[in-house]
Amino acid sequence: MYTQNQLSTLRKLSRLLTVTLFEPQIPPNTGNIARLCGANGVKLDLVGNLGFDMEDKYLKRAGLDYWNHIDWEHFPNLDNYCKTTFKNNFHLLTTKSNKSYTERVYRKNDFLIFGSETAGISDSILHAHPDNMCTIPMKNENIRSLNLATSVGIVLYEALRQITVSYTHLRAHET
């Protein structure tokens, strides 16, 4: 449980993270992720062809009336986005990695990148950046993957936890 002071710090720090969705297909997932990002002051980048219209009623329902309070942007060109983003610290979330998301070190300004619900992140991107790949471990091998919104929530809160702990540790040593 966070104190009010920790929550305030978390909100300030989390603005420096970006959640990226490559070609999301399911409106309610994107709406829920947008709401999650908005609640934490995290930017949301939607990249490539979307499997829905931004006016979709299910997208709006999942995001409720918060869309005006969410820092989000749509980048139509996947290649251009990758050229710019991959100059930063980024994490590719995929089922095709053996490294757990908890083994990664998250810092301010990081990008948490997730693929579409149906195809994930393209193999060409994964092969070009194997050191940036990580996964959410699952015990049951019969389950191929988790829901995209659930996955974003799990990884986002781990990144926020690490950033907050790091920031709190630095502040403690300043006094």
Regions picked out by a protein language model, each given a short descriptive name:
Residues 2-94, 160:
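RNA substrate-binding interface of SAM-dependent RNA methyltransferases
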Residues 29, 145-147:
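Active-site helix-initiating loop/hinge in glycosyltransferases
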Residues 40, 128-130:
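Short, structured coil segments at secondary-structure junctions
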Residues 95-98, 116-119:
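Short glycine-rich anion-binding loops that position phosphate/pyrophosphate groups of nucleotides
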Residues 139-145:
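Glycine-rich, Arg-bearing micro-motifs that act as flexible, cationic patches
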Residues 168-175:
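Conserved small/polar residues in nucleotide/adenosyl-binding loops
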